[in-house]
């Protein structure tokens, strides 16, 4: 098991910043970080998901246009704590995640990847309580989402 798992392309500044920060954190954290050449070109799906499942934290840097990326949802499903980027690839700050979920989310949001060591210190201090809280929230969110869809479908 590791503290942080990340595998991804360096396609824009936010991902470059994360990659650089991860390289400075090996002394105090067990980190598996892989820079890949392209989408799905870094490792097998099995190895990727085994890395996610074995991690306490999975940084979720911004997608190409908005902060959204499926890595955040993979982290939630793999019971890793995502650290959600609040900036777009162009560096614009967005309160995206609370807007998307329609509520205050239990996972951390970040605007400066240089703050990652401080986030890790807090996460480790509260672990595993924080992952239990997040997992309960995520299961309830999915359940409520399903009920809303069924309610609309059934009229």
Question: At which residue positions do the language-model features occur?
Answer:
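Nucleotide-sugar donor-binding catalytic core of glycosyltransferases
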Residues: 1-104, 109, 137-154
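Conserved donor-nucleotide binding/catalytic region of nucleotide-linked donor-dependent transferases
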Residues: 115-138
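Alpha-helix N-cap recognition
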Residues: 109-115
């Amino acid at each position: 098991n590791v503290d942080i798992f990340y595998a991804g392309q360096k396609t824009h500044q936010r991902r470059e910043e994360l990659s650089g920060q991860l390289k400075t954190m090996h002394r105090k954290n067990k980190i598996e970080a892989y820079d890949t050449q392209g989408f799905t070109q870094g490792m097998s799906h099995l190895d990727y998901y085994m890395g996610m499942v074995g991690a306490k934290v999975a940084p979720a840097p911004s997608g190409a246009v908005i902060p959204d990326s499926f890595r955040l949802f993979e982290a939630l499903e793999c019971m890793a704590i995502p650290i959600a980027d609040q900036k777009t690839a162009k560096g614009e700050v967005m309160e995206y995640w609370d807007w998307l979920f329609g509520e205050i989310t239990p996972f951390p949001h970040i605007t400066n990847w240089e703050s990652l060591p401080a986030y890790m210190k807090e996460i480790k201090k509260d672990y595993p309580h924080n992952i239990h809280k997040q997992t309960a929230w995520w299961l309830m969110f999915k359940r409520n989402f399903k009920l809303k869809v069924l309610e609309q479908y059934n009229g």
